[in-house]
A protein has these predicted regions:
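Nucleotidyltransferase catalytic core that binds NTPs
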Residues: 1-232
Length: 232
């Protein structure tokens, strides 16, 4: 069953109306927050962030807090793909604990529809750079056509990425193409601690090397508590 297509890529799924069911779930999650009257009344923007949070760092918290302060509601999508360091469910719980004081933030899982192996199957293609750009366009088409349209999203926030060429290219595609659909993209300079950008990969390396003091400097207390428990 077709989900979305660009000039070069067609995404199919094996479940009829799978994307429609996902949209319904997002709308139900949104309605729960809206009914509680938790909006930021100082803004008319509806924002979105898509993040991995493996783990949830002070850098992620900085980006979410910044975006939430500038939006009526902020939709925060956490990648659903299972990863080696922290499971999808644990990452979602970690983020939920880390942003629970930000009442206008609405948490969602990405399922297979945003930044997933389904949307970025570049290992099937010989021309990796060209393939990645094609997959970016597919990801943007799904976000624009379904998610932004159904949730009324007007702005997408991304963090700057000084060390990763892949993320830089993804951000470039977002900034080039989303405004064509009336969706503003704002890139926020990454939080620095001791003149170094806060990085989830650095947190993972510190954790695996049992450098828990470094971990504590780079993550919120809620994340640190979770990681400390895992060390026991």
């Amino acid at each position: 069953y077709p989900v979305a297509e660009t000039d070069h890529v067609l995404l199919l799924e094996n479940e009829r109306d799978g994307i429609k069911k996902y949209m319904k779930k997002l709308q139900e999650e949104t309605k729960m927050t809206e009914e509680n009257g938790m909006e930021n009344k100082e803004s008319d923007e509806i924002g979105a962030i898509v993040a991995n949070c493996n783990p949830f760092t002070k850098g992620h918290r900085y980006l979410v807090e910044y975006a939430a302060s500038r939006c009526r509601y902020l939709h925060l999508f956490i990648l659903s793909e299972e990863q080696e360091f922290i499971s999808s469910d644990a990452r979602f719980h970690m983020v939920s604990e880390g942003v629970k004081d930000l009442k206008n933030v609405i948490l969602h899982r990405t399922s297979d529809y945003l930044i997933s192996p389904v949307v970025f199957p570049t290992y099937f293609m010989k021309e990796k750079d060209q393939a990645f750009t094609m997959n970016c366009m597919l990801d943007i088409e799904i976000f624009r056509r379904y998610i932004a349209k159904n949730l009324g999203i007007t702005k997408r926030f991304v963090g700057s990425e000084p060390n990763c060429q892949v993320t830089n290219e993804y951000n470039r595609c977002l900034k080039e193409y989303l405004p064509q659909s009336g969706i503003e993209v704002e890139e926020i300079k990454r939080l620095e601690i001791d003149d170094m950008p806060v990085s989830a990969s650095d947190v993972r390396r510190a954790y695996e090397g049992s450098r828990m003091e470094d971990v504590k400097r780079w993550v919120p207390e809620t994340t640190y508590q979770y990681l400390s428990e895992c060390k026991k």
